[in-house]
Regions:
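Interfacial loop/beta elements and low-complexity acidic/Ser/Thr-rich segments
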Residues: 1-168
């Protein structure tokens, strides 16, 4: 409990140039080695990981390493950096908001939806997460607190170019 299993395949196709992780294929959580190979499974570190449970996995084809799940404490925010995918678009410092990946816990959904490697606009709030550390890092930072009777000014470094409407 409180762990996930990272999987490294010892056989399969080569990972495409420019990528560091092998994409998910249908193989019943790595329990069907034949399906893994027939469905185009790639050799190396996998985006897919195993959650708590018992699995019948061929140790000659797959190496499984247990790691702790990630936690973001209360009053903290998780700053996400993705380690795989297409590079950020030129002139941007963070990847755009992507939906449907369950807070970066489904790397394949993130990549399929056009997610990019690097710093992300989206943050994660306090809680526990099944992050694949080969795919994502999460840096905890304190939430911004504005005291009563004060105001906060936000300066954004992401998003479309603004337009000066001041008339100057």
């Amino acid at each position: 409990k409180g762990k996930i299993g990272l999987v490294q395949a010892e056989g399969g196709k080569e990972i495409p140039v420019g990528r560091i992780l092998a994409r998910k294929v249908q193989c019943h959580n790595f329990q069907d080695a034949k399906a893994f190979l027939e469905n185009g499974g790639q050799k190396g570190r996998q985006t897919e990981f195993l959650t708590t449970g018992t699995y019948r996995i061929n140790p000659k084809l797959f190496r499984v390493t247990s790691v702790d799940i990630s936690f973001v404490k209360s009053n903290m925010v998780g700053i996400i950096t993705v380690l795989d995918g297409e590079p950020l678009e030129q002139g941007t410092i963070a990847g755009p908001h992507i939906t449907g990946h369950n807070n970066f816990q489904d790397p394949d959904a993130f990549l399929t939806a056009g997610g990019r490697r690097g710093l992300q606009e989206q943050v994660v709030l306090s809680g526990s997460y099944n992050f694949n550390p080969w795919f994502v890092t999460c840096e905890e930072l304190p939430m911004t607190e504005i005291p009563i009777s004060h105001v906060g000014v936000v300066v954004s470094f992401v998003g479309p170019e603004g337009q000066d409407v001041s008339g100057a």
